[in-house]
Protein backbone atom coordinates (compact mmCIF):
# COMPACT_ATOMS: atom_id res chain seq x y z
CA UNK A 1 0.00 0.00 0.00
CA UNK A 2 1.38 3.40 -0.96
CA UNK A 3 1.94 6.16 1.59
CA UNK A 4 -0.67 8.28 -0.22
CA UNK A 5 -3.30 5.52 0.00
CA UNK A 6 -2.55 5.00 3.69
CA UNK A 7 -3.15 8.70 4.30
CA UNK A 8 -6.46 8.68 2.42
CA UNK A 9 -7.66 5.62 4.32
CA UNK A 10 -6.74 7.17 7.64
CA UNK A 11 -8.51 10.43 6.81
CA UNK A 12 -11.75 8.63 5.92
CA UNK A 13 -11.87 7.19 9.44
CA UNK A 14 -11.80 8.89 12.79
CA UNK A 15 -11.04 7.11 16.05
CA UNK A 16 -13.22 8.54 18.80
CA UNK A 17 -12.33 8.47 22.48
CA UNK A 18 -13.49 10.09 25.68
CA UNK A 19 -11.08 13.00 25.12
CA UNK A 20 -12.19 14.02 21.61
CA UNK A 21 -15.83 12.91 21.49
CA UNK A 22 -17.19 16.44 22.07
CA UNK A 23 -14.77 18.28 19.77
CA UNK A 24 -14.21 15.84 16.89
CA UNK A 25 -15.38 17.35 13.58
CA UNK A 26 -17.15 14.25 12.35
CA UNK A 27 -19.18 16.21 9.78
CA UNK A 28 -15.91 17.18 8.08
CA UNK A 29 -14.97 13.56 7.39
CA UNK A 30 -14.74 12.90 3.63
CA UNK A 31 -17.23 10.45 2.19
CA UNK A 32 -15.93 6.88 2.15
CA UNK A 33 -17.03 5.74 -1.31
CA UNK A 34 -16.29 2.09 -0.50
CA UNK A 35 -19.21 2.15 1.95
CA UNK A 36 -21.53 4.13 -0.32
CA UNK A 37 -22.40 1.65 -3.04
CA UNK A 38 -22.25 -2.13 -3.26
CA UNK A 39 -20.52 -4.03 -6.04
CA UNK A 40 -23.23 -6.68 -6.36
CA UNK A 41 -26.86 -6.13 -7.36
CA UNK A 42 -29.15 -6.61 -4.32
CA UNK A 43 -31.17 -9.79 -4.09
CA UNK A 44 -34.77 -9.68 -5.35
CA UNK A 45 -35.78 -10.82 -1.86
CA UNK A 46 -35.14 -7.28 -0.65
CA UNK A 47 -37.98 -5.99 -2.84
CA UNK A 48 -40.78 -8.36 -1.78
CA UNK A 49 -42.39 -5.67 0.39
CA UNK A 50 -42.10 -1.89 0.52
CA UNK A 51 -40.40 -0.56 3.65
CA UNK A 52 -39.21 2.97 4.49
CA UNK A 53 -35.53 3.84 4.88
CA UNK A 54 -34.30 0.36 3.95
CA UNK A 55 -30.87 -0.66 5.16
CA UNK A 56 -28.38 -0.95 2.25
CA UNK A 57 -27.91 -4.73 1.78
CA UNK A 58 -24.20 -4.65 0.88
CA UNK A 59 -23.24 -3.10 4.23
CA UNK A 60 -23.75 -6.42 6.03
CA UNK A 61 -21.23 -8.20 3.80
CA UNK A 62 -18.78 -5.31 4.13
CA UNK A 63 -19.25 -5.37 7.91
CA UNK A 64 -18.37 -9.08 7.93
CA UNK A 65 -15.25 -8.37 5.88
CA UNK A 66 -14.29 -5.45 8.13
CA UNK A 67 -14.75 -7.57 11.26
CA UNK A 68 -12.53 -10.27 9.76
CA UNK A 69 -9.81 -7.67 9.12
CA UNK A 70 -10.01 -6.78 12.82
CA UNK A 71 -9.42 -10.43 13.72
CA UNK A 72 -13.02 -11.17 14.72
CA UNK A 73 -14.29 -14.66 13.89
CA UNK A 74 -17.99 -14.22 13.16
CA UNK A 75 -20.45 -17.09 13.52
CA UNK A 76 -23.56 -15.22 14.68
CA UNK A 77 -24.82 -11.87 13.39
CA UNK A 78 -27.57 -9.86 15.10
CA UNK A 79 -29.76 -6.88 14.27
CA UNK A 80 -31.69 -5.50 17.25
CA UNK A 81 -33.71 -3.16 15.02
CA UNK A 82 -34.13 -5.78 12.32
CA UNK A 83 -36.92 -4.03 10.40
CA UNK A 84 -37.76 -5.87 7.19
CA UNK A 85 -34.83 -8.28 7.56
CA UNK A 86 -32.13 -6.89 5.28
CA UNK A 87 -29.29 -7.79 7.65
CA UNK A 88 -31.02 -11.10 8.38
CA UNK A 89 -31.08 -12.14 4.73
CA UNK A 90 -27.50 -11.02 4.03
CA UNK A 91 -26.17 -12.78 7.13
CA UNK A 92 -27.84 -16.04 6.10
CA UNK A 93 -26.64 -15.62 2.51
CA UNK A 94 -23.12 -15.42 3.98
CA UNK A 95 -23.84 -18.66 5.89
CA UNK A 96 -23.94 -17.07 9.33
CA UNK A 97 -26.47 -17.65 12.10
CA UNK A 98 -28.80 -14.73 12.74
CA UNK A 99 -30.68 -13.25 15.66
CA UNK A 100 -33.00 -10.28 15.30
CA UNK A 101 -35.84 -8.46 17.00
CA UNK A 102 -38.23 -5.64 16.23
CA UNK A 103 -41.28 -4.29 18.01
CA UNK A 104 -43.22 -3.99 14.75
CA UNK A 105 -45.01 -7.27 13.82
CA UNK A 106 -45.26 -6.22 10.17
CA UNK A 107 -41.48 -5.83 10.05
CA UNK A 108 -40.85 -9.25 11.58
CA UNK A 109 -43.36 -10.84 9.20
CA UNK A 110 -41.35 -9.52 6.24
CA UNK A 111 -38.06 -10.49 7.89
CA UNK A 112 -39.20 -14.06 8.57
CA UNK A 113 -40.37 -14.38 4.97
CA UNK A 114 -36.98 -13.24 3.63
CA UNK A 115 -35.13 -15.70 5.83
CA UNK A 116 -36.73 -18.80 4.37
CA UNK A 117 -36.39 -20.85 1.22
CA UNK A 118 -39.69 -22.03 -0.22
CA UNK A 119 -40.63 -25.00 -2.38
CA UNK A 120 -41.99 -23.57 -5.66
CA UNK A 121 -44.40 -26.47 -6.03
CA UNK A 122 -45.85 -25.80 -2.58
CA UNK A 123 -46.33 -22.12 -3.44
CA UNK A 124 -48.17 -23.05 -6.65
CA UNK A 125 -50.29 -25.63 -4.85
CA UNK A 126 -51.41 -23.19 -2.18
CA UNK A 127 -51.96 -20.43 -4.72
CA UNK A 128 -54.36 -22.59 -6.77
CA UNK A 129 -56.33 -23.44 -3.63
CA UNK A 130 -56.49 -19.80 -2.57
CA UNK A 131 -57.73 -18.82 -6.04
CA UNK A 132 -60.40 -21.50 -6.02
CA UNK A 133 -61.72 -20.39 -2.64
CA UNK A 134 -61.52 -16.68 -3.50
CA UNK A 135 -63.73 -17.13 -6.56
CA UNK A 136 -66.13 -19.54 -4.88
CA UNK A 137 -69.21 -18.61 -2.90
CA UNK A 138 -69.61 -15.28 -1.14
CA UNK A 139 -68.57 -14.92 2.48
CA UNK A 140 -70.15 -13.33 5.51
CA UNK A 141 -67.85 -10.59 6.67
CA UNK A 142 -66.59 -10.38 10.22
CA UNK A 143 -68.00 -7.29 11.92
CA UNK A 144 -64.49 -6.20 12.90
CA UNK A 145 -63.56 -5.63 9.26
CA UNK A 146 -66.80 -4.21 7.86
CA UNK A 147 -67.28 -1.72 10.71
CA UNK A 148 -63.70 -0.84 11.65
CA UNK A 149 -63.49 2.93 11.24
CA UNK A 150 -59.85 2.92 10.11
CA UNK A 151 -60.43 0.23 7.50
CA UNK A 152 -63.51 2.08 6.23
CA UNK A 153 -61.47 5.28 6.13
CA UNK A 154 -58.75 3.81 3.92
CA UNK A 155 -60.73 1.41 1.69
CA UNK A 156 -63.83 1.49 -0.49
CA UNK A 157 -66.50 -1.10 0.43
CA UNK A 158 -65.81 -3.35 -2.56
CA UNK A 159 -62.09 -3.39 -1.70
CA UNK A 160 -62.87 -4.27 1.90
CA UNK A 161 -64.99 -7.20 0.75
CA UNK A 162 -62.40 -8.54 -1.71
CA UNK A 163 -59.56 -8.16 0.78
CA UNK A 164 -61.59 -9.95 3.42
CA UNK A 165 -62.30 -12.81 0.99
CA UNK A 166 -58.61 -13.05 0.11
CA UNK A 167 -57.54 -12.98 3.74
CA UNK A 168 -60.10 -15.65 4.64
CA UNK A 169 -58.98 -17.81 1.71
CA UNK A 170 -55.33 -17.65 2.79
CA UNK A 171 -56.18 -18.57 6.39
CA UNK A 172 -58.44 -21.45 5.31
CA UNK A 173 -56.06 -22.96 2.77
CA UNK A 174 -52.49 -22.50 4.00
CA UNK A 175 -51.60 -25.04 6.68
CA UNK A 176 -47.92 -24.46 7.40
CA UNK A 177 -46.83 -21.33 9.28
CA UNK A 178 -43.86 -20.90 6.95
CA UNK A 179 -46.12 -20.57 3.90
CA UNK A 180 -48.73 -18.60 5.82
CA UNK A 181 -46.03 -15.95 6.38
CA UNK A 182 -45.23 -16.00 2.65
CA UNK A 183 -48.83 -15.40 1.57
CA UNK A 184 -49.53 -12.90 4.35
CA UNK A 185 -46.45 -10.98 3.27
CA UNK A 186 -47.84 -10.85 -0.28
CA UNK A 187 -51.24 -9.80 1.08
CA UNK A 188 -49.68 -7.06 3.22
CA UNK A 189 -47.66 -5.72 0.30
CA UNK A 190 -50.75 -4.98 -1.85
CA UNK A 191 -52.78 -3.15 0.79
CA UNK A 192 -51.57 0.36 -0.03
CA UNK A 193 -52.11 -0.01 -3.78
CA UNK A 194 -55.64 -1.32 -3.11
CA UNK A 195 -56.43 1.55 -0.74
CA UNK A 196 -56.91 5.32 -0.96
CA UNK A 197 -53.38 5.83 0.36
CA UNK A 198 -51.58 8.41 -1.77
CA UNK A 199 -49.29 6.62 -4.23
CA UNK A 200 -45.56 6.91 -3.39
CA UNK A 201 -46.35 8.63 -0.10
CA UNK A 202 -44.62 6.96 2.83
CA UNK A 203 -46.65 8.76 5.45
CA UNK A 204 -50.46 8.37 5.74
CA UNK A 205 -52.31 10.58 3.28
CA UNK A 206 -55.59 10.09 1.42
CA UNK A 207 -55.79 10.56 -2.34
CA UNK A 208 -59.51 11.13 -3.06
CA UNK A 209 -58.95 10.77 -6.82
CA UNK A 210 -56.87 7.60 -6.69
CA UNK A 211 -57.92 4.74 -8.93
CA UNK A 212 -57.57 1.71 -6.67
CA UNK A 213 -56.28 -1.57 -8.03
CA UNK A 214 -58.10 -4.86 -8.39
CA UNK A 215 -57.33 -6.98 -5.32
CA UNK A 216 -56.90 -10.32 -7.07
CA UNK A 217 -54.81 -8.91 -9.94
CA UNK A 218 -52.49 -7.17 -7.47
CA UNK A 219 -52.17 -10.35 -5.41
CA UNK A 220 -51.33 -12.44 -8.51
CA UNK A 221 -48.72 -9.93 -9.58
CA UNK A 222 -47.15 -9.91 -6.12
CA UNK A 223 -47.04 -13.71 -5.84
CA UNK A 224 -45.27 -13.92 -9.21
CA UNK A 225 -42.75 -11.35 -8.03
CA UNK A 226 -42.12 -13.23 -4.80
CA UNK A 227 -41.79 -16.55 -6.63
CA UNK A 228 -39.02 -15.08 -8.80
CA UNK A 229 -37.32 -13.67 -5.72
CA UNK A 230 -37.50 -17.02 -3.96
CA UNK A 231 -35.97 -18.84 -6.93
CA UNK A 232 -32.95 -16.52 -6.85
CA UNK A 233 -32.65 -16.46 -3.05
CA UNK A 234 -29.24 -17.42 -1.65
CA UNK A 235 -30.71 -18.52 1.66
CA UNK A 236 -30.55 -22.27 2.23
CA UNK A 237 -33.58 -24.17 3.48
CA UNK A 238 -31.91 -25.28 6.69
CA UNK A 239 -30.55 -22.19 8.42
CA UNK A 240 -30.23 -20.84 11.93
CA UNK A 241 -32.33 -17.69 12.14
CA UNK A 242 -34.32 -16.48 15.12
CA UNK A 243 -36.51 -13.37 14.85
CA UNK A 244 -38.53 -12.06 17.78
CA UNK A 245 -41.36 -9.53 17.78
CA UNK A 246 -40.33 -7.49 20.78
CA UNK A 247 -38.26 -4.50 21.78
CA UNK A 248 -34.54 -4.96 22.33
CA UNK A 249 -35.06 -3.36 25.74
CA UNK A 250 -37.31 -6.26 26.75
CA UNK A 251 -34.89 -9.02 25.76
CA UNK A 252 -33.90 -11.53 28.43
CA UNK A 253 -30.41 -12.74 27.54
CA UNK A 254 -28.64 -15.20 29.83
CA UNK A 255 -25.20 -14.72 28.33
CA UNK A 256 -23.68 -12.93 25.31
CA UNK A 257 -23.82 -15.02 22.13
CA UNK A 258 -23.43 -12.60 19.20
CA UNK A 259 -20.12 -12.02 17.39
CA UNK A 260 -21.18 -9.08 15.22
CA UNK A 261 -24.12 -6.73 15.60
CA UNK A 262 -25.10 -4.79 12.47
CA UNK A 263 -27.99 -2.39 12.86
CA UNK A 264 -29.51 0.96 11.95
CA UNK A 265 -31.36 2.51 14.91
CA UNK A 266 -34.49 4.58 14.31
CA UNK A 267 -34.09 8.34 14.25
CA UNK A 268 -35.99 10.69 16.50
CA UNK A 269 -38.28 13.20 14.68
CA UNK A 270 -38.36 10.76 11.75
CA UNK A 271 -40.94 8.06 10.95
CA UNK A 272 -43.77 6.76 13.12
CA UNK A 273 -43.53 3.16 11.95
CA UNK A 274 -46.81 2.26 13.67
CA UNK A 275 -48.59 4.84 11.50
CA UNK A 276 -46.84 3.82 8.28
CA UNK A 277 -47.79 0.14 8.66
CA UNK A 278 -51.29 0.70 10.01
CA UNK A 279 -53.03 -0.99 7.04
CA UNK A 280 -51.16 -4.26 7.56
CA UNK A 281 -51.56 -4.02 11.34
CA UNK A 282 -55.34 -3.73 10.95
CA UNK A 283 -55.82 -6.38 8.26
CA UNK A 284 -53.50 -8.96 9.81
CA UNK A 285 -55.25 -8.42 13.14
CA UNK A 286 -52.09 -7.56 15.03
CA UNK A 287 -54.03 -4.94 16.95
CA UNK A 288 -57.44 -3.24 16.60
CA UNK A 289 -55.65 0.08 17.14
CA UNK A 290 -52.38 0.63 15.29
CA UNK A 291 -51.47 3.38 17.77
CA UNK A 292 -50.83 0.61 20.29
CA UNK A 293 -47.44 0.03 18.63
CA UNK A 294 -46.32 3.60 19.28
CA UNK A 295 -45.89 2.57 22.92
CA UNK A 296 -42.35 1.37 23.50
CA UNK A 297 -41.25 2.37 20.01
CA UNK A 298 -37.80 3.97 20.18
CA UNK A 299 -37.82 7.26 18.29
CA UNK A 300 -41.57 7.80 18.62
CA UNK A 301 -42.79 11.28 19.47
CA UNK A 302 -45.38 9.75 21.79
CA UNK A 303 -45.23 8.44 25.37
CA UNK A 304 -42.17 10.37 26.53
CA UNK A 305 -41.33 10.63 30.23
CA UNK A 306 -41.07 13.97 31.97
CA UNK A 307 -37.86 15.87 31.25
CA UNK A 308 -37.15 16.05 34.96
CA UNK A 309 -36.63 12.28 35.00
CA UNK A 310 -34.71 11.98 31.73
CA UNK A 311 -32.34 14.94 31.76
CA UNK A 312 -30.17 13.60 34.64
CA UNK A 313 -29.69 10.34 32.71
CA UNK A 314 -28.37 11.98 29.52
CA UNK A 315 -24.74 11.91 28.49
CA UNK A 316 -23.12 15.21 27.59
CA UNK A 317 -23.82 15.00 23.84
CA UNK A 318 -27.48 14.23 24.42
CA UNK A 319 -27.89 16.92 27.06
CA UNK A 320 -26.43 19.55 24.73
CA UNK A 321 -29.02 18.80 22.02
CA UNK A 322 -31.95 18.66 24.44
CA UNK A 323 -31.05 21.97 26.05
CA UNK A 324 -30.79 23.68 22.65
CA UNK A 325 -34.18 22.31 21.66
CA UNK A 326 -35.85 23.13 24.98
CA UNK A 327 -35.73 26.87 24.36
CA UNK A 328 -37.42 26.40 20.95
CA UNK A 329 -39.83 23.49 21.31
CA UNK A 330 -40.38 21.85 24.71
CA UNK A 331 -42.42 18.95 23.27
CA UNK A 332 -39.66 18.02 20.83
CA UNK A 333 -37.05 18.40 23.58
CA UNK A 334 -39.02 15.90 25.65
CA UNK A 335 -39.20 13.41 22.75
CA UNK A 336 -35.49 13.76 21.97
CA UNK A 337 -34.55 13.26 25.62
CA UNK A 338 -36.64 10.06 25.72
CA UNK A 339 -35.00 8.82 22.52
CA UNK A 340 -31.49 9.44 23.85
CA UNK A 341 -32.25 7.80 27.20
CA UNK A 342 -33.65 4.79 25.33
CA UNK A 343 -30.59 4.58 23.08
CA UNK A 344 -28.29 4.68 26.10
CA UNK A 345 -30.30 1.78 27.54
CA UNK A 346 -29.96 -0.03 24.20
CA UNK A 347 -26.16 0.26 24.35
CA UNK A 348 -26.22 -1.19 27.88
CA UNK A 349 -28.36 -4.07 26.61
CA UNK A 350 -25.93 -4.71 23.76
CA UNK A 351 -23.27 -5.47 26.37
CA UNK A 352 -25.43 -8.47 27.34
CA UNK A 353 -25.88 -9.56 23.73
CA UNK A 354 -22.45 -9.21 22.09
CA UNK A 355 -19.70 -11.42 23.47
CA UNK A 356 -16.31 -10.14 24.59
CA UNK A 357 -14.10 -9.89 21.53
CA UNK A 358 -17.11 -9.15 19.33
CA UNK A 359 -18.09 -5.91 17.64
CA UNK A 360 -20.93 -3.67 16.49
CA UNK A 361 -21.53 -1.67 13.34
CA UNK A 362 -24.17 1.05 13.51
CA UNK A 363 -25.55 3.00 10.56
CA UNK A 364 -27.03 6.24 11.86
CA UNK A 365 -27.77 9.71 10.55
CA UNK A 366 -28.16 13.14 12.04
CA UNK A 367 -31.35 15.13 11.61
CA UNK A 368 -32.35 18.73 12.07
CA UNK A 369 -35.41 20.35 13.57
CA UNK A 370 -36.06 24.09 13.61
CA UNK A 371 -32.37 24.82 13.00
CA UNK A 372 -31.23 22.57 15.87
CA UNK A 373 -28.89 19.77 14.83
CA UNK A 374 -29.97 16.45 16.33
CA UNK A 375 -26.52 14.88 16.67
CA UNK A 376 -27.51 11.21 16.88
CA UNK A 377 -24.12 9.91 15.75
CA UNK A 378 -22.11 11.73 18.41
CA UNK A 379 -24.59 10.76 21.13
CA UNK A 380 -24.39 7.10 20.13
CA UNK A 381 -20.58 7.14 19.98
CA UNK A 382 -20.38 8.70 23.45
CA UNK A 383 -22.83 6.09 24.77
CA UNK A 384 -20.58 3.32 23.44
CA UNK A 385 -17.48 4.86 25.01
CA UNK A 386 -19.24 5.25 28.35
CA UNK A 387 -20.09 1.53 28.35
CA UNK A 388 -16.48 0.50 27.77
CA UNK A 389 -16.45 -0.10 24.01
CA UNK A 390 -13.10 0.55 22.36
CA UNK A 391 -11.70 1.14 18.87
CA UNK A 392 -14.77 3.31 18.25
CA UNK A 393 -14.27 4.25 14.62
CA UNK A 394 -16.55 6.53 12.62
CA UNK A 395 -16.92 6.83 8.84
CA UNK A 396 -19.24 8.84 6.64
CA UNK A 397 -21.15 7.46 3.65
CA UNK A 398 -23.49 8.99 1.10
CA UNK A 399 -27.10 7.82 1.03
CA UNK A 400 -28.12 6.30 -2.30
CA UNK A 401 -31.28 4.48 -3.41
CA UNK A 402 -33.01 4.91 -0.09
CA UNK A 403 -36.75 5.45 0.36
CA UNK A 404 -36.15 8.66 2.23
CA UNK A 405 -36.83 12.28 1.42
CA UNK A 406 -33.52 14.13 1.95
CA UNK A 407 -35.03 17.56 2.55
CA UNK A 408 -36.95 19.25 5.35
CA UNK A 409 -38.85 22.51 5.29
CA UNK A 410 -38.21 25.35 7.76
CA UNK A 411 -40.26 23.55 10.42
CA UNK A 412 -38.33 20.31 10.09
CA UNK A 413 -41.01 18.43 8.15
CA UNK A 414 -40.12 16.17 5.22
CA UNK A 415 -40.22 17.96 1.88
CA UNK A 416 -39.31 17.27 -1.75
CA UNK A 417 -38.45 20.94 -2.22
CA UNK A 418 -34.74 21.14 -3.05
CA UNK A 419 -34.61 24.70 -1.74
CA UNK A 420 -35.20 23.32 1.74
CA UNK A 421 -32.27 22.24 3.89
CA UNK A 422 -30.66 19.02 2.76
CA UNK A 423 -29.95 17.07 5.90
CA UNK A 424 -30.12 13.43 4.92
CA UNK A 425 -27.56 13.24 2.13
CA UNK A 426 -25.01 11.46 4.33
CA UNK A 427 -25.01 9.14 7.30
CA UNK A 428 -22.41 7.68 9.63
CA UNK A 429 -21.03 4.21 10.23
CA UNK A 430 -19.80 3.60 13.76
CA UNK A 431 -17.72 0.50 14.41
CA UNK A 432 -16.98 -0.45 18.01
CA UNK A 433 -15.43 -3.46 19.74
CA UNK A 434 -16.24 -4.85 23.15
Q: What function would you assign to each model-found segment?
A:
Residues 106-173, 279-310:
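Conserved phosphoryl-transfer catalytic core
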Residues 267-349:
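SAM-dependent methyltransferase catalytic-core segment centered on the flexible catalytic loop
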Residues 67-76, 94:
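Short helix-loop-beta connector
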Residues 160-263, 268-276:
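SAM-dependent nucleic-acid methyltransferase catalytic core
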Residues 351, 355, 411-434:
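Core SAM-dependent methyltransferase catalytic element
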Residues 60, 77-94, 98-105, 111, ...:
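Conserved proline-anchored active-site loop of SAM-dependent methyltransferases
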Residues 346-356, 387:
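Conserved helix-to-beta-strand junction in the class I
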Residues 1-70:
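S-adenosyl-L-methionine
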Amino acid sequence: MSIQYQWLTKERNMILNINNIHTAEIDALPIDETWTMGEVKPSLMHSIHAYPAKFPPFITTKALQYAKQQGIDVHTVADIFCGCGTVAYEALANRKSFFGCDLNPVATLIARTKCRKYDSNEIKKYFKRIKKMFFSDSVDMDEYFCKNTRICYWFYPNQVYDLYKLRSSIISVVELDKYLDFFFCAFSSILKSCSKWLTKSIKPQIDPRKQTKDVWEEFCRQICKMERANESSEVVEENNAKILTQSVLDLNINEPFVDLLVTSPPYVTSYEYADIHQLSTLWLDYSPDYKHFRTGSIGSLYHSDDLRFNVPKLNQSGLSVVMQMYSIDKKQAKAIAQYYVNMQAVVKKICNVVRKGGACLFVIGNTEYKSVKIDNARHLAESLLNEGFYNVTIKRRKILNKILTPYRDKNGKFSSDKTSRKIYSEEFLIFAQI
